[in-house]
Design a protein with these regions (language model features):
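Short amphipathic alpha-helical segment within the helicase RecA-like ATPase core
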Residues: 1-170
Length: 170
């Protein structure tokens, strides 16, 4: 089992050094989990800007930074659409050094994050807001990404034997 260890040292009121120990052959999912753990540990801190020195990371862990940042981003999700008082701002991570994620990786991670957050938003909406008609309306907007979308009416759903779905959507 992968053991993650994050230790921080406060050097002044404005500066903290954070050390993260890594295993030699860190998998992508473990790097994401490490990012999530980092976010959990520091999300309530007064510090919102962090720097990651990628030169201290072995080049055979090529995708570590991208996966680490991806884990932070996924963990930072908050559904605050109906909150009157929003939580404080997101943390900012600046990567310095040679081992930074390339543009293709950043684009891939960004696309995954947008899709994940869109799905989480749909799941978090209350039923009186996201009823079947509203859900169909929102899903139709995804056709601009090349998705083929077919919206079934009640008659078609009955014909397909989806009675439970019809019952839930009443």
């Amino acid at each position: 089992k992968f053991k993650k260890k994050i230790v921080s040292f406060e050097i002044s009121s404005k500066r903290t050094i954070i050390l993260i120990s890594l295993e030699k052959n860190l998998s992508s999912s473990n790097a994401e989990n490490l990012g999530a753990k980092f976010y959990d540990q520091f999300k309530d801190s007064n510090k919102i800007e962090y720097e990651v020195n990628s030169d201290t990371i072995s080049s055979n862990l090529k995708n570590l930074i991208g996966n680490f940042l991806h884990g932070i981003k996924l963990k930072s999700y908050k559904f605050e659409k109906y909150k009157t008082k929003k939580d404080k701002g997101d943390i900012s991570i600046n990567v310095i050094g040679k081992n930074i994620p390339n543009n293709n990786d950043q684009l891939k991670f960004s696309s995954i994050e947008k899709g994940t957050f869109y799905t989480r938003d749909l799941v978090s909406e209350p039923g009186n807001i996201l009823h079947p008609d509203e859900y169909a309306k929102r899903i139709k907007t995804l056709s601009k990404f090349g998705l083929k979308i077919k919206i079934y009416n009640d008659k078609e759903l009955k014909k397909l034997g989806m009675n439970t779905l019809l019952g839930v959507g009443q």
